[in-house]
Regions:
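Alpha-helical transmembrane segments of multi-pass membrane proteins predominantly involved
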Residues: 1-469
Length: 469
């Protein structure tokens, strides 16, 4: 039985071992280079990812509080792959940083919480995992200790996270008071329609998730947090953290509140519309590229919610597929932005005018990533949004798809505006040729292959759909 526990929890165990190993390395030897710390982290993350595709255990432990199956393993593999890419991208930034080991420890701690959160089948484990995945993020947001805006970002992240966690905890308390259980399965079997307290509990939990994924109207400090955080942390917040919460959101909606499907359909549709429109409108007027990507990510959440509104296996598969595509696309863009900011300090959109003149490889990588985020064929972002809209149309809300299509056209303007700056516009102060270290180069190549390959490989969506069923 003990061996079975280890196999079922191999992701969590490897991440925990990596954290403990980094702590020992940090305490025991100050002479170990940051590059060695990065190599240890990346090596063990890669080992966890490989084992995640080789070992395919299914079962429950801890009194059915922790559940593992093929779908949960896929979600964890996606998050680990994204974290590995971010770790590779951050190596240049952390090369001479005094506290590099602490960065990786915090990064892995929040990843550990996300893995537990995905396997949670009990609200107590879910909440504890949520806090484990959230608290280290505040420290990461404040990692540039010498910058005032980094401290401001951390403070705003703490306040918004505390508020959202409080809403969730209050909702969970009401559920426990009316059902007598915190188990997902037992709550789903006990919950009833037209029970005001249970409906209120659902609204509170939904609002808590809304804060975590930056859906409108719960998005207010998102851009400030993204702008003030280091680029590596911003990319982690926008992709990995948001992806993990969306994975759990699928489980809670479909497994716990399936009885309320008719009610949460309209709620999700309304929130998705506001999220798309407001995210797009604010993205149009941004000059800082990190704030731009913040509102871009808010708009993308609107599309994800449209796909989720279908409430079927197709919906779940389309959301997971889009998150895979979004990880490659967003991290590809952030990889270039991190390099530019780290070496030049520039983060204004106009700073990218004439970028292609001296940095052809980086320009193509950023251009492909932006094409994917815009949903332009044949890159993967087009197919990701196509599957989301197809799922959203399952209930016949073609007007919703029409509004989403209009928003896609609007988003083309601000994505292609950056592409125009890179490839067409000229500047007397264009960015000089930037050196690319081997690890960030590997990360960027992985992202480009992922963006192109996941779009051309039709079997990926089918693979995800089979696991969902």
């Amino acid at each position: 039985m003990q061996t079975n526990y280890f196999i079922l929890m191999h992701h969590e165990l490897i991440i925990t071992i990596t954290i403990m190993l980094l702590l020992v390395i940090k305490v025991g030897s100050d002479k170990l280079s940051n590059q060695m710390v990065a190599n240890v982290t990346n090596g063990l993350l890669l080992a966890s990812l490989v084992l995640g595709f080789i070992l395919k255990p299914e079962g429950n432990v801890f009194g059915d509080m922790f559940h593992t199956d093929g779908f949960a393993l896929l979600q964890k593999n996606i998050l680990i792959a994204g974290t590995l890419i971010i770790s590779l991208q951050a190596s240049t930034w952390l090369k001479d940083y005094e506290h590099a080991a602490e960065f990786y420890i915090l990064l892995l701690s929040t990843l550990l919480g996300m893995c537990f959160m995905i396997s949670s089948r009990h609200f107590l484990m879910f909440y504890l995992s949520l806090e484990l995945s959230t608290i280290p993020l505040a420290a990461l947001a404040n990692f540039d200790l010498h910058l005032k805006r980094s401290s401001e970002a951390a403070l705003k992240l703490i306040i918004s996270s505390a508020f959202s966690s409080g809403l969730m905890l209050l909702g969970i308390s009401f559920l426990y008071g009316t059902t007598g259980s915190l188990s997902f399965a037992e709550v789903a079997n006990t919950i009833q329609l037209n029970t005001p307290l249970q409906l209120f509990a659902f609204v509170l939990i939904f609002a808590g998730f809304g804060f975590k994924i930056s859906a409108v109207p719960f998005h207010l400090w998102t851009a400030d947090v993204y702008e003030g955080s280091p680029v590596a942390v911003t990319s982690y917040l926008s992709v990995i953290s948001k992806g993990a919460v969306l994975f759990v959101f699928i489980t809670v909606l479909f497994n716990v509140f399936a009885l309320y499907a008719h009610s949460w359909y309209y709620l999700i549709v309304i929130v998705s519309l506001f999220t798309m429109v407001i995210g797009n409108l604010f993205a149009l007027r941004q000059t800082n590229i990190k704030r731009f990507l913040a509102f871009s990510s808010i708009s993308q959440v609107g599309f994800i919610l449209i796909g989720l509104s279908g409430g079927t296996h197709t919906s779940a598969a389309s959301v997971v597929y889009f998150i895979v595509v979004y990880i490659f696309s967003n991290l590809g863009a952030f990889g270039v932005i991190a390099l530019v900011q780290g070496l030049t300090g520039k983060e204004n959109i106009n700073d990218y005018k004439g970028f292609y003149l001296n940095n052809k490889m980086l320009s193509w990588m950023l251009g492909i990533a932006l094409f994917s985020l815009a949903g332009i064929p044949p890159v993967a972002g087009f197919f990701g949004k196509f599957f989301l809209l197809l799922s959203g149309a399952e209930k016949g809300a073609y007007w919703l798809i029409a509004i989403a299509a209009i928003n896609m056209v609007v988003s083309l303007y601000y994505y292609l505006n950056i592409v125009k700056n890179i490839f067409i516009d000229k500047s007397d102060n264009s960015i000089e040729k930037l050196p690319i270290a081997i690890q960030p180069r590997i990360a960027m190549i992985i992202c480009v292959i992922g963006v192109v390959g996941s779009g051309l490989c039709g079997g990926l969506y089918q693979y995800i759909f089979d696991l969902v069923k």
